[in-house]
Amino acid sequence: MAAASLAVFCRRVSAALKASTSLISSQTLASTGCRFSLSLLTKNTPNVTSFHQCRLLQTTLSRRGLEEFFDDPKNWGEEKVKSGASWTCQQLRNKSNEDLHKLWYVLLKERNMLLTLEQEAKRQRLPMPSPERLEKVVDSMDALDKVVQEREDALRLLQTGQEKPRPGAWRRDIFGRIIWHKFKQWPIPWYLNKRYNRKRFFAMPYVERFVRLRIEKQARIKARKISLTQKKEKFLQKKFPHLSEAQKSSAA
């Protein structure tokens, strides 16, 4: 029922777009009156050397790519749509920058289409067919962004030797925390800059006690998480002993 209603909506939109395109094209042809033959052109215009040098009137489609915001008509009315696996970082590292640039726009168009489909399904209060497609596209775009960032970092390290895109240094603030301080250009020297001098890149001696307490708290939280995961693993092994035995045999 959900897929059928979405299919009806998409068919109506496509029919409206086709009707508007045919109407505008007929109006432009009737108004311009560009129907003439090659023989008349050669007789009336002796200075023109060839017909290929003449540029006819061109009009863009009224749809302007709106059909790309909707799914393929073959998938209309289907409850499940087959889709491939998402792109991994290892696969994207083997591609050139030009291929990654093209793939980014392909994924962006696919994401816009799926978001349109998701919004229409929410409007009709119906389930979206194969919602995992949107998750795969998002994962692929995240992996592509990560690969591009890796290449930018490698190029920056080769040219300037800096790890961060913006130069800076590790400093200690007044609370005893180690932070990354980003450098910034100022029109006046640092010793005349009151705003910069208000920053304190040191900690008082009485802060060391609280730094130890913060480290102990972080260590307790980490140990609590590790013990919780171990308890979950033991519980699952007791509840599903056949799975644990199969895992041990596959590892051996």
Swiss-Prot record:
Molecular-function GO terms, alphabetical: structural constituent of ribosome
GO annotations of cellular component type: mitochondrial inner membrane; mitochondrial large ribosomal subunit
GO BP field: mitochondrial translation
Chief place where the protein resides: mitochondrion
Keyword Transit peptide: yes
Superkingdom, natural source: Eukaryota
InterPro entries (alphabetical): MRP-L47_sf, Ribosomal_uL29_mit
Location of N6-acetyllysine modifications: K146
Keyword Zinc tagged: no
Localization in the cell: Mitochondrion
One Pfam family from the record: MRP-L47
Gene3D superfamilies reported in the protein's UniProt record: 6.10.330.20
Sorted UniProt keywords: Acetylation, Mitochondrion, Ribonucleoprotein, Ribosomal protein, Transit peptide
Subunit structure, as described in the record: Component of the mitochondrial ribosome large subunit (39S) which comprises a 16S rRNA and about 50 distinct proteins.
Family: Belongs to the universal ribosomal protein uL29 family.
PANTHER family: LARGE RIBOSOMAL SUBUNIT PROTEIN UL29M, RIBOSOMAL PROTEIN L47, MITOCHONDRIAL-RELATED
Protein name stated in the entry: Large ribosomal subunit protein uL29m
Originating organism: Bos taurus
